């Protein structure tokens, strides 16, 4: 099921063929700095890559890990996988939001306690209900609808616990696209600290 936001301006879909390759030296430096980047749509492939990196870093050391998130959202279950893996490993993970942190990206963002949730000043956040589409028999459509409702209820509980807002307020807010600036997100309980430079991490 999808859980993604739409950009305010029309943009071409990401084309994997246009992605810039990361050299071995850059990968080695990222590993040494214990940094992971979650940029772009949340997919099964991205989840596999990120979870593999998390486990590898955890095996190498108990030192803190930094995860940078800039995502429009995507596949909910893939977001769940990253969310749960961040909680599963032993090292403390700090998450830094940048650009926009939307939908399934926000689900990943709240996988750590508020004091370890940071963002850059111009980051925007988007919370909303999951969506899904199915074709086929009426019974299949009914099953899909029930699953979306259950997923929405689960996400409401997650964001309520993460922000300190009541489940009723979360449910009301995400009835439509709910956008927050960095300052709004901090007031809402989504962000622990807004940072402007690496020295503040």
UniProtKB/Swiss-Prot annotation:
Which GO terms are recorded in the biological process aspect for this UniProt protein?
protein quality control for misfolded or incompletely synthesized proteins
Which segments of the protein form a coiled coil according to its record?
A: none
Instruction: Classify the source by domain of life.
Output: Bacteria
Q: Which family does it belong to?
A: Belongs to the peptidase S14 family.
What is the annotated localization of this protein? Cytoplasm
Question: What function does this protein fulfil?
Answer: Cleaves peptides in various proteins in a process that requires ATP hydrolysis. Has a chymotrypsin-like activity. Plays a major role in the degradation of misfolded proteins.
Q: List the disulfide bonds.
A: none
Would you tell me the protein name for this molecule?
A: ATP-dependent Clp protease proteolytic subunit 3
Q: What is its EC number?
A: 3.4.21.92
Cite the active-site annotation: 103 (nucleophile), 128
Q: Cite the record's note on assembly.
A: Fourteen ClpP subunits assemble into 2 heptameric rings which stack back to back to give a disk-like structure with a central cavity, resembling the structure of eukaryotic proteasomes.
Quote the SUPFAM superfamilies the UniProt record gives: ClpP/crotonase
The protein's matches in Pfam families, at most eight in alphabetical order, are given as:
CLP_protease
Q: Name one GO molecular function term.
A: ATPase binding
Kindly state which reaction or reactions the protein catalyses: Hydrolysis of proteins to small peptides in the presence of ATP and magnesium. alpha-casein is the usual test substrate. In the absence of ATP, only oligopeptides shorter than five residues are hydrolyzed (such as succinyl-Leu-Tyr-|-NHMec, and Leu-Tyr-Leu-|-Tyr-Trp, in which cleavage of the -Tyr-|-Leu- and -Tyr-|-Trp bonds also occurs)
Q: Which Gene3D superfamilies match?
A: 2-enoyl-CoA Hydratase, Chain A, domain 1 (3.90.226.10)
Q: Name one GO cellular component term.
A: cytoplasm
Where does the UniProt entry say this protein principally localizes? cytoplasm
Report keywords, A-Z.
Cytoplasm, Hydrolase, Protease, Serine protease
Which CDD domains did the record assign?
A: S14_ClpP_2
Q: Which organism is it from?
A: Agrobacterium fabrum (strain C58 / ATCC 33970) (Agrobacterium tumefaciens (strain C58))
């Amino acid at each position: 099921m999808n859980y993604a936001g739409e950009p305010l301006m029309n943009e071409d879909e990401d084309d994997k063929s246009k992605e810039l390759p990361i050299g071995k030296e850059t990968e080695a430096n990222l590993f040494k700095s214990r940094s992971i980047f979650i940029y772009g749509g949340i997919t099964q492939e991205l989840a596999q890559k990120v979870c593999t990196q998390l486990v590898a870093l955890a095996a190498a050391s108990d030192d803190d890990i930094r995860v940078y998130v800039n995502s429009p959202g995507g596949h909910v279950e893939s977001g769940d996988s990253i969310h749960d893996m961040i909680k599963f490993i032993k090292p403390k993970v700090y998450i830094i939001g940048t650009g926009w942190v939307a939908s399934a990206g926000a689900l990943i963002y709240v996988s750590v306690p508020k004091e370890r949730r940071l963002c850059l000043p111009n980051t925007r956040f988007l919370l909303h209900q999951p969506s899904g589409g199915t074709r086929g028999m009426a019974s299949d459509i009914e099953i899909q609808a029930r699953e979306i409702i259950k997923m929405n209820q689960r996400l409401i509980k997650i964001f309520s616990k993460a922000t300190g807002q009541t489940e009723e307020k979360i449910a009301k807010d995400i009835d439509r696209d709910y956008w927050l600036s960095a300052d709004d997100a901090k007031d809402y309980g989504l962000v622990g600290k807004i940072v402007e430079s690496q020295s503040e991490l």
